[in-house]
Every structure is written in structure tokens, then in C-alpha cells.
């Protein structure tokens, strides 16, 4: 089948039509196609460079002429598997990687208990244009997201040239604010108790109470099951003892009957 080249020559034909007056107005796509002309080479070649990463997909290594296989022969050529170019994923889009995700993952890996704090999804939507000159933001609680955004701000404003130093500075500010927050909460609780406030059990105490109730129920069920098993064993042993006693009595009766029969037979023989 002949290769169709009409679409490739559209720029030349349109230029000729414009010069001869066949087309009066320049098409909207003319300048774009003129700046980026279509490819005129139709020879298909294997893609050995990934256009997304500009890295080689595969590269044949020179055979090791000094190594000998198990048959005592030298390898001088590539096999079919080595010549195969694995370019199935060459046009697969690369994964999107953001610096925020790396910082966020590192922070919550180092501080896993920060994930246990209650959080509302709409908290970040309150202030859509925050200024991260300060760690604390109006309407947004202190959490790991403050550390992430503060680190990016330090890098963007060139206050810290290294991401490690920026992350350490953001963590230090976070620790100071967290300690201040916990101290304020503790002082407020002590003042409230001084004025007569009574606080109920905390979440941890409530969980421990519920767990203890389950353990007590399990203990009662285990004791009941143990009593049932011991009763079954006693009944089984008692039934086995009764059966052995009945069989022994029956054996005695049979022995007595056999003895009487043998005695009568001996007396008849003597009388005769």
C-alpha cells in the first residue's frame, strides 16, 4: 500500500494556493503548522529514549568474552531476551511527585501520634490565602500541615537554602507552639478545677473502662465453660464406673450359676 503524503504536504499546497490566489485569506492554522511542520520521515524506528524522562529504555551490554559457560564455551552474541527492548511503558505518564508530599510523609512518620488528633476536612478552606511568615494561622489548628507550609515558605523566601535546615527550623517552631498550647490547656484545666469544675473521664479512660468490661465478661464465660467441662468429665467417669460395677456383678452371678450347675452334676454322678 502506498504511503499517503497528502497531509504532510498541506503546508506547501496551501502556500501555493495563497500565491496563486486560489485562497484569499490565510487559514488560522497556517502560522502554527509553519512554525512546527509535520514530520516527513515515515521510517519507523525503535524508541530507545523515554521522552518523559530522557533516559535510555534499555541498553545492550558488551558480552563478557572472558567468562565461560557451563559447556565450556564463550559467549560472543546476545540472545533473543537480551535483544528485546522493553518499551511497553515508554509512553506511560510519570508519577506526579510533589515536595509537599515528601515533607508530609516524613513528618507523620516521625510523629505518628499527630494523626490521632481530631481534624475536620474543611479546616484548610477557611483561610484561602495564608501568610506563612508565622506558624500559627487564624482559624486553622496547629498540625503537621503548618510544618509543611512553613518549610516551603522558608525555601521560597531563601531564608534557608537547604530543605533539611528549613524542615528543622519549622519543626523547632512547631515544638515550641505545641508545648505552649499544652501548657495553656493544663493551666486552664487547673483553674477550672479550682473554681469547682468536674471533668468526666477522658477518651483513654473511657476506652480502658470498656475494655475492662469485655475482659470481665470473657472471664465469667471462661469460668462457666470450665465448670461445664469438669462436670462432663465427672459424669463420664461416673458412668464408666457404674458400667464396670454392673459388668463385675454380672460376671459374679454367671460364676455362681456355673458353679451350682457343676456341683449338681457331680452329685448326680456320685449318686449313680
Curated annotation (Swiss-Prot):
Q: Where is the composition biased (Acidic residues)?
A: 252-272
GO MF, one example: structural constituent of ribosome
Q: InterPro entries, alphabetically?
A: Ribosomal_mS23_fun
Tell me which UniProt keywords the record has, alphabetically.
Mitochondrion, Ribonucleoprotein, Ribosomal protein
Question: GO terms for CC?
Answer: mitochondrial small ribosomal subunit
What subcellular compartments does it reside in? Answer: Mitochondrion
Which stretches of sequence are listed as region Disordered? 233-272
Tagged with keyword Repressor: no
Q: Where are the transmembrane segments?
A: none
Q: Which Pfam families match?
A: MRP-S25 (PF13741)
Subunit architecture: Component of the mitochondrial small ribosomal subunit.
Similarity section: Belongs to the mitochondrion-specific ribosomal protein mS23 family.
Q: Would you tell me the protein name for this molecule?
A: Small ribosomal subunit protein mS23
In its UniProt entry, the species of origin is given as: Candida glabrata (strain ATCC 2001 / BCRC 20586 / JCM 3761 / NBRC 0622 / NRRL Y-65 / CBS 138) (Yeast)
- What are the top taxonomic ranks of the organism? Eukaryota, Fungi, Dikarya, Ascomycota, Saccharomycotina
Amino acid at each position: 500500500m502506498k504511503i499517503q503524503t497528502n497531509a504532510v504536504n498541506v503546508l506547501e499546497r496551501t502556500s501555493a494556493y495563497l500565491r496563486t490566489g486560489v485562497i484569499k485569506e490565510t487559514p488560522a492554522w497556517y502560522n502554527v503548522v509553519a512554525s512546527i511542520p509535520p514530520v516527513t520521515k515515515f521510517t519507523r524506528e525503535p524508541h530507545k529514549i523515554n521522552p518523559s524522562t530522557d533516559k535510555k529504555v534499555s541498553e545492550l551490554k558488551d558480552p563478557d568474552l572472558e567468562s565461560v559457560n557451563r559447556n565450556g564455551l564463550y559467549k560472543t552474541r546476545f540472545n533473543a531476551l537480551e535483544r528485546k527492548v522493553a518499551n511497553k511503558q515508554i509512553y506511560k505518564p510519570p508519577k506526579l511527585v510533589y515536595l509537599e508530599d515528601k515533607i508530609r510523609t516524613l513528618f507523620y512518620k516521625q510523629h505518628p501520634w499527630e494523626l490521632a488528633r481530631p481534624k475536620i476536612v474543611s479546616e484548610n478552606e477557611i483561610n484561602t490565602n495564608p501568610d506563612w511568615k508565622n506558624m500559627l494561622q487564624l482559624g486553622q489548628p496547629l498540625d503537621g500541615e503548618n510544618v509543611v507550609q512553613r518549610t516551603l515558605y522558608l525555601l521560597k523566601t531563601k531564608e534557608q537554602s537547604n530543605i533539611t535546615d528549613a524542615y528543622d527550623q519549622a519543626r523547632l517552631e512547631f515544638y515550641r507552639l505545641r508545648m505552649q498550647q499544652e501548657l495553656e490547656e493544663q493551666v486552664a484545666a487547673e483553674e477550672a478545677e479550682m473554681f469547682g469544675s468536674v471533668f468526666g473521664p477522658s477518651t483513654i479512660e473511657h476506652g480502658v473502662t470498656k475494655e475492662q468490661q469485655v475482659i470481665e465478661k470473657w472471664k465469667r464465660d471462661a469460668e462457666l465453660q470450665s465448670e461445664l467441662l469438669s462436670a462432663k468429665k465427672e459424669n463420664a467417669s461416673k458412668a464408666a464406673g457404674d458400667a464396670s460395677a454392673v459388668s463385675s456383678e454380672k460376671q459374679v452371678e454367671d460364676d455362681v450359676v456355673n458353679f451350682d450347675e457343676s456341683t449338681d452334676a457331680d452329685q448326680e454322678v456320685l449318686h449313680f
